[in-house]
Amino acid sequence: MAEAVLRVARRQLSQRGGSGAPILLRQMFEPVSCTFTYLLGDRESREAVLIDPVLETAPRDAQLIKELGLRLLYAVNTHCHADHITGSGLLRSLLPGCQSVISRLSGAQADLHIEDGDSIRFGRFALETRASPGHTPGCVTFVLNDHSMAFTGDALLIRGCGRTDFQQGCAKTLYHSVHEKIFTLPGDCLIYPAHDYHGFTVSTVEEERTLNPRLTLSCEEFVKIMGNLNLPKPQQIDFAVPANMRCGVQTPTA
């Protein structure tokens, strides 16, 4: 029993990217859009990936990457965001050698376009791309190659999910994406979402499979709830989406 507990404790340390773990993980927050940005690095090779950077906090991210002695290979987006402008474009200029990455189905510009099943490699690690459309057609979830953690974007939030009433969203598609691409991961796989509005930072597949108030419903009930949310549109959508279609590079003013 003691050995089993120790193995679990060691795995949890590894999953969280603590000082004794081979992978480095940092979770950062942008308060205006309540967006999480994730830095993952291989402590051995010093190669790193940044998930869902925000324009306003990209200089902060670049500074941290330099302080930690990492080399950023990719600035990746889980989808074309509507509530903030991505920092991918700025990071390409702040950290030469960094490439922007987004799903091909997003229709957005990037250095590299990915599809379901593609891997993003950094050092000894890789992020598996799992298409998880529904919030938008181009949404993806990034799963670490040992299935210890998943970065779910807006597809799956902690006790919630992304909305489906704009950007060609589809509630039925989202329901099946989460159940087939995320809930099939191990129960102790850590869930790291793109946003949280209630002070939470992380969940697990098992927690969301059993406790998520929307996604524990039937598909029919889920579709009905999502169709009756009547939420206001994101404040930045009119300029965030066009900018994000250009990798966060805004049109120069005359």
From Swiss-Prot:
Broad enzyme group: oxidoreductase
Paste the cofactor note: Binds 1 Fe(2+) ion per subunit.
N6-acetyllysine is found on 66, 172
Looking up InterPro entries in the UniProt record yields: Metallo-B-lactamas (IPR001279), Mito_Persulfide_Diox (IPR051682), POD-like_MBL-fold (IPR044528), RibonucZ/Hydroxyglut_hydro (IPR036866)
Q: Which cellular components does GO assign to this protein?
A: cytoplasm; mitochondrial matrix; mitochondrion; nucleoplasm
A molecular function annotated in GO for this UniProt entry is: iron ion binding
Q: Which GO terms describe its biological process?
A: glutathione metabolic process; hydrogen sulfide metabolic process
Cofactor(s) annotated in UniProt: Fe(2+)
Please give the chief subcellular localization of this protein: cytoplasm
Q: Does the keyword Transmembrane helix apply?
A: no
Locate the residues binding Fe cation.
79, 135, 154
Gene3D superfamilies the UniProt entry points to: Ribonuclease Z/Hydroxyacylglutathione hydrolase-like
Which catalytic reaction applies to this protein? S-sulfanylglutathione + O2 + H2O = sulfite + glutathione + 2 H(+)
Recorded disease:
Ethylmalonic encephalopathy: Autosomal recessive disorder characterized by neurodevelopmental delay and regression, recurrent petechiae, acrocyanosis, diarrhea, leading to death in the first decade of life. It is also associated with persistent lactic acidemia and ethylmalonic and methylsuccinic aciduria.
Recorded protein name is Persulfide dioxygenase ETHE1, mitochondrial
